[in-house]
Design a protein with these regions (language model features):
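Short HxH-centered metal-ligating active-site micro-motif
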Residues: 63, 67-95
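C-terminal binding/interaction regions
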Residues: 2-27, 82-142
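Charged, well-structured alpha/beta interaction segments
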Residues: 27-31, 46-47
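Glycine/charged-rich beta-loop-alpha catalytic/anionic-binding loops adjacent to active sites
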Residues: 42-56, 87-88
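Compact, glycine-rich, soluble single-domain proteins
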Residues: 52-67
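Short beta-strand scaffold segments in enzyme catalytic cores
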Residues: 31-42
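A generic structural signal for short beta-strands and their flanking turns/coil linkers
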Residues: 32-34, 50, 84-86
Length: 142
């Protein structure tokens, strides 16, 4: 299997997992269902975790699908270290193809927890990376 075959397979697998997660979104206000899937390298091997957006009447408390999935990924890592996220996929069931790009808060979460990950969006053919999503991003020098 070539690297291109591997990436194509990963993309299909993660987008399918994100689509399944989106079906479980709680969106009584916007009716805009989003799912995300994250590939994580763990000591036991590669795992896929997912999350869906969960809305709240106080909109600022709404949890995006990307952040839900990244929070789940943190549970798979070593305590005190970020998870080893290799790829993230996002699907919006009620979105036009390519419309479901991450919000600013999710982009910052990606910068913190998945800086080297490939980013797949349903309807966008190219594989995106953090520099595409958040150029000149804020970081703290540690």
């Amino acid at each position: 299997m070539t690297e291109m075959d591997h990436l194509a397979g990963e993309r299909v697998e993660l987008l399918a997992a994100a689509r399944e997660a989106a079906a479980h979104a709680w969106t009584p206000y916007s009716h805009f269902r989003v799912g995300a899937a994250v590939a994580v390298d763990t000591a036991e091997g590669r795992r896929i975790v997912s999350g869906a957006n969960v809305e709240n009447a106080s909109y600022g408390l709404t949890l995006c699908a990307e952040r839900a999935a990244l929070a789940a990924a943190c549970q798979l890592g070593v305590a005190g270290e970020p998870p080893r996220v290799t790829a993230v996929a996002v699907v919006g069931l009620d979105a036009q193809p390519g419309e479901c790009m991450p919000c600013g808060a999710c982009r910052q979460w990606l910068a913190e927890l998945a800086p080297d990950a490939a980013y797949y969006v349903e309807g966008v053919e190219e594989t995106l990376h953090l520099d595409d999503l958040l150029p000149r991003r804020f970081t703290l020098n540690r």
